[in-house]
């Protein structure tokens, strides 16, 4: 007769599903109250299990936070890689990546990157997560640099542009409310329009050059005063 416990792969899948449920609920509470104000008792209560049950899936609260932030960062990395793999103009890839970024930071694990972050964790864990963040920054820099080279993005410092984009998009995860008047899609549309319009190259674009001097990009002829 078949084992009532199921096959080994089935048991592994069930355990993974339950572990993700633990992490997701913990992320929700971290986002609501902060890491230090959250207890494992609250996580267990919301899951309708005992606290000792949690230790079958996680070691401690530090591990939970690390995994929550790590999942969020992995999803951002996968989304950006997917958009880049689609090809096309760098500005189009960048806008698509920004849209995916907003979608993820308004979800439980992505929001946890912003609201809880890696600061409460031990140094080794912080270093790992910050190296993942650095990779996301490199994606943005490369796209901006490519866009400048192909002419779809205005001449600017790719590092500053990448920091500006990532900072603005990440902060959405701080102030976003699921019960707010705007959906993640609507927020993404408005924020990306503001950010991307500042990047798109145009004949009347003015950029800030080295030393803070402005460089006019306008190609239209100046009108000669009459009268």
Region locations from a protein language model:
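N-terminal intrinsically disordered/low-complexity leader segments
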Residues: 1-17, 203-227
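Helix-turn-helix
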Residues: 17, 21, 25, 29-63, ...
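Hydrophobic/aromatic residues within well-ordered alpha-helical segments
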Residues: 18, 61, 72, 76, ...
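Conserved hydrophobic residue
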Residues: 35-36, 149, 153
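Hydrophobic alpha-helical connector segments
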Residues: 67, 81-107, 161-165, 208-209
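Amphipathic alpha-helical packing segments from all-alpha helical-bundle domains
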Residues: 71-77, 104, 124-150, 159-163, ...
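Amphipathic alpha-helical segments used for helix-helix packing
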Residues: 93, 105-124, 141, 174, ...
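Hydrophobic alpha-helical segments that form the core
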Residues: 101-102, 155-174, 186-198
